[in-house]
Amino acid sequence: MRVIQTAGKRKTAVARATIREGKGRVRINHKPVEIIEPEIARFTIMEPLILAGEEIVSRVDIDVKVEGGGFMGQAEAARVAIARALVEWTNDMNLKEKFMKYDRTMLVGDSRRTEPHKPNRSTKGPRAKRQKSYR
């Protein structure tokens, strides 16, 4: 039995996806993807599944474990992990091209991270300054 593991990151969230032969079940942290709330996060996670098509998704089971970050960061990390898993499972360049054309970050990831706080007014953020008055 073939098993493939992939990972996806977004901000501080890390998702690890395991894909194997099955009946089309997709689970995020042991929950079926259909009951993930909020709805926007569910749709984000399902993007690669919809793009790949029913004939590919119905033949595999995907388990994703996500930790860290907020709900949207977790959803986008899961989306990256699922997309990478599907491309690796099918070895299909057309699918990879379809994902890249739709949204490049689905396979490549988003390298943006939060800027570290600077020492001036550390609790306020990286660029916060005291307000300056001229009169």
UniProtKB/Swiss-Prot annotation:
SUPFAM superfamilies: Ribosomal protein S5 domain 2-like. Gene3D superfamilies: 3.30.230.10. The keyword Metal-binding does not apply. PROSITE patterns: RIBOSOMAL_S9. Residues 108-118 have a biased composition (Basic and acidic residues). NCBIfam families: PRK00474.1, uS9_arch. This is Small ribosomal subunit protein uS9. It comes from Thermococcus kodakarensis (strain ATCC BAA-918 / JCM 12380 / KOD1) (Pyrococcus kodakaraensis (strain KOD1)).
